[in-house]
């Protein structure tokens, strides 16, 4: 087993008490790379609550955050590096990708004893930059800050936002844009593509080191299993099935589910062209680069399975020395993923429509509601929220029916729903409370994100950004003062495409 996770001796208490296990792995896992300084950094947002959770000195970091989170100042104990990985991008394999604009500063052990990465995105070029400038524009940095923190508040496993800094210098894309650096916190940044990097090189020794490291760090409960590497594939499959089910429960579309954007830890990562669905349509795509709809809303579970199959391929030489046996064992897990996902998804959908018990007909009940929503172009988030309100009192039926173009279209479904509720033991009050706890009032709607970004980029005005963060921190509360944030966009406000950035 790997021994890279032992704690290093700490002689003093720096503002970030680094303990860098990944940097103790062999050199083929990364390239040492310091951030490139920027002209005039300015701290625009610092997550002091997360800093406290991580055991950091929030006071020092807020005071000196511009220099620290831009990469201009390197703290004691940091061992900056760019991680090596490969990946399938829209189905095509690229044997070397790696961190082209991200630099891992190091790791900390948080107050709950969990090891967490701290990474700068947009901190300058690395050996993996592939002719890129290694920089990030302000807009994508704000988008990732907003959406990752919103996902956390929704209760979905995700990377976190620790800080955002403007650089005082432009980045050049189709036009000159203000530059920024994003500080991301993750359980780790190990991806399916990290395994693919070594598999593509036939480097089984490094694969074994990586797999043992991942078991130590993320899945210590399986380290003594008879077939540790098969158990690893199974554990990752379970977390991914649960994660993607949660995405669907809130109408989230990742947008670029390449294997280099799928974490081994089971966290959502890389929010470049992501978006939340307004009107329900399972074929919804927002990403400008997803021209074939590969990563559409309803395709996400199948893509998760496809990505897991790619992970399984890399683990074959570790699972069993006989290839046919290894393939058979791995295939068993990959094939079981669909049923596993369906179990997680249906459990969540039962909760969304207020069911505490299970009946075989529940799937039909859920699917028939979704069919009416699609036909009527009903807003995904608002419809389920209003259903929770309706569960509290029949007086709220008109508001629920108003989610549909033809309010009468949902009446047959409501009759079936009420009949089913009659066989469910919850009281109306308990049911409504439970439903409002899983059906958010607020999600980061695309038009609100774009408004916040436009104000920041064009006017240096971060008030909309701050307001949006405040609303999204309490997604399951009604917040009457912010009721407009719960509404879908007007036709002129609709965002039809999102773009990669960070």
Swiss-Prot record:
Active site: 260 (proton acceptor)
GO MF terms, alphabetically ordered: AMPylase activity; ATP binding; magnesium ion binding
SUPFAM superfamilies given in the database record: Protein kinase-like (PK-like)
Signal peptide: none
Residue numbers binding ATP: 98, 100-101, 121, 133-134, 184, 191, 270
EC number(s) recorded for this UniProt protein: 2.7.7.-, 2.7.7.108
Full protein name: Protein nucleotidyltransferase YdiU
Organism: Rhizobium rhizogenes (strain K84 / ATCC BAA-868)
């Amino acid at each position: 087993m790997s021994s890279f996770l032992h704690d290093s001796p700490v002689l003093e208490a720096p503002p970030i008490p680094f303990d860098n296990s990944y940097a103790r792995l062999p050199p083929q896992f990364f390239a040492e790379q310091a951030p490139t300084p920027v002209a005039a950094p300015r701290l625009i947002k610092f997550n002091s609550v997360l800093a406290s959770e991580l055991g950091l000195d929030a006071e020092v970091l807020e005071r000196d955050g511009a220099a620290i989170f831009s990469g201009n100042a390197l703290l004691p104990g940091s061992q900056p590096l760019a991680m090596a990985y490969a990946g399938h991008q829209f189905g095509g394999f690229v044997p070397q990708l790696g961190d082209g604009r991200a630099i891992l500063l190091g790791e900390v052990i948080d107050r709950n004893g969990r090891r967490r990465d701290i990474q700068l995105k947009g901190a300058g070029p690395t050996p993996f930059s592939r002719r890129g400038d290694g920089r990030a524009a302000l807009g994508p940095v704000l988008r990732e800050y907003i959406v990752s923190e919103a996902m956390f508040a929704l209760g979905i496993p995700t990377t976190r936002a620790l800080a955002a800094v403007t650089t005082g210098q432009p980045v050049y894309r189709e036009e000159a844009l203000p530059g920024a650096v994003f500080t991301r916190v993750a359980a780790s940044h190990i991806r399916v593509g990290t395994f693919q990097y070594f598999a593509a090189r036939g480097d089984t020794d490094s694969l074994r080191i990586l797999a043992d490291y991942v078991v130590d760090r993320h899945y210590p409960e399986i380290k003594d299993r008879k077939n540790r590497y098969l158990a690893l594939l199974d554990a990752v499959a379970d977390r991914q099935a649960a994660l993607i089910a949660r995405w669907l429960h809130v109408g989230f579309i990742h947008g670029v589910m390449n294997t280099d954007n799928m974490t081994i830890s089971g966290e959502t990562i890389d929010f470049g062209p992501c978006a939340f669905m307004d009107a329900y349509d399972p074929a919804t795509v927002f990403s400008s680069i997803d021209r074939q709809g590969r990563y559409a809303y309803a395709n996400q579970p199948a893509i998760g399975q496809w990505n897991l199959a790619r992970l399984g391929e890399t683990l074959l030489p570790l699972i069993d020395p006989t290839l046919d046996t290894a393939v058979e064992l791995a295939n068993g897990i990959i094939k079981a993923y669909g049923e596993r996902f369906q179990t997680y998804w249906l459990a969540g959908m039962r909760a969304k429509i207020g069911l505490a018990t299970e009946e075989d007909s529940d799937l039909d009940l859920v699917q028939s509601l979704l069919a009416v929503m699609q036909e009527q172009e009903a807003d995904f988030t608002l419809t389920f929220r209003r259903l929770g309100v309706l569960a509290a009192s029949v007086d709220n039926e008109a508001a629920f029916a108003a989610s549909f173009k033809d309010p009468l279209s949902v009446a047959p479904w409501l009759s079936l729903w009420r009949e089913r509720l009659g066989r469910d033991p919850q009281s109306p009050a308990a049911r409504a409370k439970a439903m409002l706890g899983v059906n958010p009032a607020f999600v980061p709607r695309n038009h609100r994100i774009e408004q916040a970004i436009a104000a920041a980029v064009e006017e240096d005005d971060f008030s909309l950004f701050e307001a949006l963060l405040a609303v999204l921190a309490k997604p399951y509360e009604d917040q009457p003062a912010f009721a407009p944030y719960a509404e879908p966009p007007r036709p002129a406000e609709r965002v039809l495409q999102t773009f990669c950035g960070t």
